[in-house]
Amino acid sequence: MASPRLGIFCCPTWDAATQLVLSFQPRVFHALCLGSGTLRLVLGLLQLLSGRRSVGHRAPATSPAASVHILRAATACDLLGCLGIVIRSTVWIAYPEFIENISNVNATDIWPATFCVGSAMWIQLLYSACFWWLFCYAVDVYLVIRRSAGRSTILLYHIMAWGLAVLLCVEGAVMLYYPSVSRCERGLDHAIPHYVTTYLPLLLVLVANPILFHKTVTSVASLLKGRKGVYTENERLMGAVIKTRFFKIMLVLIACWLSNIINESLLFYLEMQPDIHGGSLKRIQNAARTTWFIMGILNPAQGLLLSLAFYGWTGCSLDVHPPKMVIQWETMTASAAEGTYQTPVRSCVPHQNPRKVVCVGGHTSDEVLSILSEDSDASTVEIHTATGSCNIKEVDSISQAQGEL
């Protein structure tokens, strides 16, 4: 579970609100974290094996899009962060004597405090990087649709995601543990920067990503209408697929992390009270404990739920391969009509070979749409670029295709 309270636990003194949640059934809480994290790792491994098996039956992609690299990086960050939660919870359950020495000021063994700080910073860093990568994904898909030239720079995204994650994590840790671990958490002036650096990437994703996704969906609709000047049923289905994917992403993020925001709001409210153990605050205390346990279950499950949002429910099966709907679009050609309508993506010019289309600066419009609807090898919709008329294969019905989503 990714929470700034994990870092505060390493301090010898806790505020009353932190004491309220950290001392309430700690073994049960870490058992829930361990179970949720282990389930995410096991099912994630099954999904990875299933994806590799399905890739073996396809021609390898020549140049993966930047969004594919971004999703792989976000998945890796979430996987390693979840692994940190599993290791931390395992130690908490298996070695209670080791954990008791963490907050002991007079203890001579530095390893308990070192493990506490290291595991807390490890979890915070990787989940922060995951949030930055998800923000980069929203930015990238919007830029791919909107701009007319150039190619996404994955190096810039690496610098942005890892640089900001490391910077905020180090700054929050220095402010929290200054001047030393044995003398930290002596007031809100030390703790607040730690909270800000922890939740800033999360709040950015929850606020900015829906805006970028909405703008992308609007641009995709304009792009599909501009291909032939009409908006066919297949193009409506294509737009619905992209819109559904973005909706699933935000639904997972809100479901997994809204409990963190509610919990921290309740704990901050309790910290402002002169006596948090008053009878009038009993319901708020119970709500804080409840959301604390919900965080322990949902935070490690984020990666699994996001992968299901991207790849579908059948991604966790090693044998089930759902029928795919293959839509072949006509490639764009240089014409007078294109001169009157400037598409938001890179223009394409036909060469001598009628089966090939040369892209000026990057992906064709078909590939751009494929990036948005098929970031995985297990997507329910595939789009292939080909000349000629529109040809639909393996389509039972549009309602069945929407049912698979």
From Swiss-Prot:
Among InterPro entries, the record links this protein to: GPR143 (IPR001414)
Q: Does the keyword Transmembrane helix apply?
A: yes
Q: Which residues form the signal peptide?
A: none
Q: Which GO terms describe its cellular component?
A: apical plasma membrane; cell junction; Golgi apparatus; lysosomal membrane; melanosome; melanosome membrane; nuclear body; plasma membrane
Q: Which residues lie on this side of the membrane: Extracellular?
A: 1-27, 100-124, 175-191, 270-292
Motif lysosomal/melanosomal membrane localization signal location, chain numbering: 222-231, 329-330
Q: What is its main location?
A: membrane
The reply to whether Cell membrane figures as a keyword in the UniProt entry is: yes
Entry text on domains: The cytoplasmic domain 3 and the C-terminus tail domain contain the lysosomal sorting signals and are necessary and sufficient for intracellular retention and delivery to lysosomal and melanosomal, respectively in melanocytic and non-melanocytic cells.
Protein name (Swiss-Prot/TrEMBL): G-protein coupled receptor 143
**Which species does the entry assign this protein to?**
Mus musculus (Mouse)
